[in-house]
Amino acid sequence: MLKSIVHEIIGAPRRTLDFPQSLQQFRGRKRVLIIFADAQDDRPLIQHQWLRKAHMRLIEEDVEVFSIAGGGAFALFDEDWELDADDIRERLQGPPPGEFGLILIGRDGLVKMRSHEPRHAEDIFKALEMLPRKALWQ
């Protein structure tokens, strides 16, 4: 968070993130929404409820949703994927264990949105509207 504040105030360049190896399978094909759901409050539950209500739209927008909790990564909806939760948390500079976070990743592998609070599906869809519909490279 401090890095983000410094970047906003003085324009210091952000460190380029290494894309997590276990998310490479989505690069150029899908958008990925990661929910860090270890928080000991109701934020993960609220976020999951909001996303479940928007399930069909998430499918239409080619968004895979994963929840990271307890050292594991789990698909919020149907498919099971082999993901390395610790690598994702580290490389995407996710919140520390025990904290809530949300990260939206575009098809290009770049982080498009971060939040430490649950976001309504419409907020996520607005962020998606700013992204290309199809991958520019494969």
Where are these regions (language model features)?
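Non-catalytic interaction/Regulatory regions outside core domains
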Residues: M1-Q138
